[in-house]
């Protein structure tokens, strides 16, 4: 079929139907959203939960939500800017931080639902494939599906690091190893050691070592915060191991006290008096004037 030019005449505009607002803004993939939100018709009042992973320049957001007609409802959320209280001060947007954020949201939602003792997940991180097995005499594992939005699903992407953290945290998420670091599309094989190295930030440590040897100025510029905190390449694995254990020990969200907004405002004019204050002021003026007259007459 040859090229057909679209004639934008009256009939074209009369039949034209605009796309959804969030599709016009390039924010939502409705083809994927439909399949992530529609539940089987024989499952009544059972929402389909989604593990939502969103990446920004300075933060990683991981949420567990389900869809309702009035809008999505978030069951639980975790952010990479919470990681400093678990000992991770820098590198809050790399693969290792994404894994920790996924682990945090998994332990947090299971703690909220009272399933954290039944489903501990993978306590020893090896980088290998892990799937949660439901217990025989108890509730099933919490099942959800990965929602990456408009992010590119390339092999080794950070969204899959967050998913791996959630799976190791005890959530039941359908997945394969084909998108984890260490998978080779040519040989169709998966190297778990490469994946484990990414989970513990060893790819960052290797880059730190090579950059320090090749260009010390670039090393000081790119890793200035690491240098300021005294973090070396050999320290990263221990930092992430301690963070994983700290997350498992206490995944709950701590509500920070809001700063008091009691600000003393400057006033450039006189404050308006109430009726009682005005009467008191006039009475004081009268008493002072009478006292002044009496002192003059006595003199």
Curated annotation (Swiss-Prot):
Known partners and oligomeric status: Component of the large ribosomal subunit (LSU). Interacts with Fmr1 to form the RNA-induced silencing complex (RISC), a ribonucleoprotein (RNP) complex involved in translation regulation, other components of the complex are Rm62, RpL11, AGO2 and Dcr-1.
Organism: Drosophila melanogaster (Fruit fly)
A Pfam short name: Ribosomal_L5e
Transmembrane residue ranges: none
GO cellular component, as recorded: cytosolic large ribosomal subunit; cytosolic ribosome; nucleus
Chief place of localization: cytoplasm
Function text: Component of the ribosome, a large ribonucleoprotein complex responsible for the synthesis of proteins in the cell. The small ribosomal subunit (SSU) binds messenger RNAs (mRNAs) and translates the encoded message by selecting cognate aminoacyl-transfer RNA (tRNA) molecules. The large subunit (LSU) contains the ribosomal catalytic site termed the peptidyl transferase center (PTC), which catalyzes the formation of peptide bonds, thereby polymerizing the amino acids delivered by tRNAs into a polypeptide chain.
Keywords: Cytoplasm, Nucleus, Ribonucleoprotein, Ribosomal protein, RNA-binding, rRNA-binding
Superkingdom in the source lineage: Eukaryota
Official protein name in the record: Large ribosomal subunit protein uL18
């Amino acid at each position: 079929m040859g090229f057909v030019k679209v004639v934008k005449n009256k009939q074209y505009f009369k039949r034209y139907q605009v796309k959804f607002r969030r599709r016009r803004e390039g924010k939502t993939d409705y083809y994927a959203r439909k399949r992530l939100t529609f539940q089987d018709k024989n499952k009544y009042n059972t929402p389909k939960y989604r593990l939502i992973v969103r990446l920004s320049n300075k933060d990683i957001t991981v949420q567990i939500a389900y869809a309702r007609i009035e809008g999505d409802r978030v069951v639980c959320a975790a952010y990479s800017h919470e990681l400093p209280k678990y000992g991770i001060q820098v590198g809050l947007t790399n693969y290792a931080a994404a894994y920790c954020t996924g682990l945090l949201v998994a332990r947090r939602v299971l703690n909220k639902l009272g399933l954290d003792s039944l489903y501990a997940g993978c306590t020893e991180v090896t980088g290998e494939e892990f799937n949660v097995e439901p217990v025989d005499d108890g509730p099933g594992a919490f099942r959800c599906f990965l929602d990456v939005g408009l992010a590119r699903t390339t092999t080794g992407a950070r969204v899959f690091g967050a998913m791996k953290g959630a799976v190791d945290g005890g959530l039941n998420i359908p997945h394969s190893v084909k998108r984890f670091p260490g998978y080779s599309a040519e040989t169709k094989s998966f190297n778990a050691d490469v994946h484990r190295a990414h989970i513990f930030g060893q790819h960052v440590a290797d880059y730190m070592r090579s950059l320090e040897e090749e260009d010390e100025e670039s090393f000081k510029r790119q890793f200035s915060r690491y240098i300021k905190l005294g973090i070396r390449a050999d320290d990263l694995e221990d930092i992430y191991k301690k963070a994983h254990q700290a997350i498992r020990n206490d995944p709950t969200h701590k509500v920070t006290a809001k700063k008091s907004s009691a600000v003393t405002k400057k006033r450039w004019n006189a404050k308006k008096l109430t009726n009682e204050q005005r009467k008191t002021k006039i009475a004081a003026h009268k008493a002072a004037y009478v006292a002044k007259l009496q002192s003059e007459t006595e003199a």
